Amino acid sequence: MNDFYEGLGNDKKLSIIAGPCVFEDSNLAVDIASSLSETCKKYDVNFCFKMSFDKANRTSIKGYRGKGIELAMNVFDHIHSELGVSTITDVHDAWQAEIINTSIIQIPAFLCRQTDLLEAAVLTGKPVNVKKGQFLSPWEMKNVVDKLKSFGYNR
């Protein structure tokens, strides 16, 4: 399992997922991850670095979306291997789930019911974090959980 997820629980220390909203620069991303990691170690906080390689949900077509998956994968690898920090990012398509090298895969709220995307995320064997869509009631998320379980997810 993933180190970050093993540290979660009511009887465990505080956990945070933090990082820049969008991937803008490799050096900046590593600097942010390093600084957050040091601060979390100082205060004994469980930490996972989050960064979006593509903000596909921008309101305007002119909005900055990120540097893309290929460059982001290099940064995620560096942060995990050099800093020892777990990583997480959103995926928007099944093929992205299949190749992304983060420790954890996150499904964005607006895509939380997409069956093929959920299946692809589960098939990676990684922890999957699904954000609740604003259009769903809390009890409707049971259907999302049922989909995950139907693909063999048991975390």
Predicted features and spans:
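Conserved anion-binding
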Residues: 59, 102, 107-155
